[in-house]
């Protein structure tokens, strides 16, 4: 079995950039790495992603949103993540089940037990071995996210960026609470620094504190 690392953070935290940098670093050290994302990661889940992130779909109810995320995750786990882990890869995933607890649980106010039940079903009880939380101020993150959207080509995936500041503050607080509750699984990194500085902090902690001391064989 491989090793499963997830990246979490609010909009504009820089996790997508950092997951790519960690992947490159691990590959340079000889590890076999699969990088993926949620929502999405495979053809069916990418179609669900287009619904979830399209700002024109602002009328999606919280429960519909939760169920769509669960459906996308169920397909992604079955088609991509579990097969990659069985092949012995390190899987790096941009968002996973913690995002649902933060966004749909805390942000949307859906009861924790409902989110937990759907997460367990969609994940087939799979849990990350390690989660990297990149934390940053909400205003800073949203400004970064909006700049990215304005310069990106393709569909404008901005439904969550258009939410009120209070929504994003609730999501950030939920992430910090999750990290506090499971310090053995979470690495929390300050996302306010430069890209290289953040990358060095993540690589150092992943390699020195986790991979070298884990019971998982990463050969």
UniProtKB/Swiss-Prot annotation:
InterPro entries: P-loop_NTPase, Thymidylate_kin-like_dom, Thymidylate_kinase
Domain of life of the organism encoding this protein: Bacteria
GO MF: ATP binding; dTMP kinase activity
GO BP annotations listed: dTDP biosynthetic process; dTTP biosynthetic process; dUDP biosynthetic process
Transmembrane segments: none
EC number: 2.7.4.9
Keywords: ATP-binding, Kinase, Nucleotide biosynthesis, Nucleotide-binding, Transferase
GO cellular component assignments: cytosol
Pfam families cross-referenced by the UniProt entry: Thymidylate_kin (PF02223)
Enzyme category, top tier: transferase
Binding annotation for ATP: 9-16
Catalytic activity: dTMP + ATP = dTDP + ADP
Matching NCBIfam families: DTMP_kinase
Protein family membership: Belongs to the thymidylate kinase family.
Function: Phosphorylation of dTMP to form dTDP in both de novo and salvage pathways of dTTP synthesis.
UniProt protein name: Thymidylate kinase
Organism ancestry: Bacteria, Pseudomonadati, Thermodesulfobacteriota, Desulfuromonadia, Desulfuromonadales
Gene name in the database record: tmk
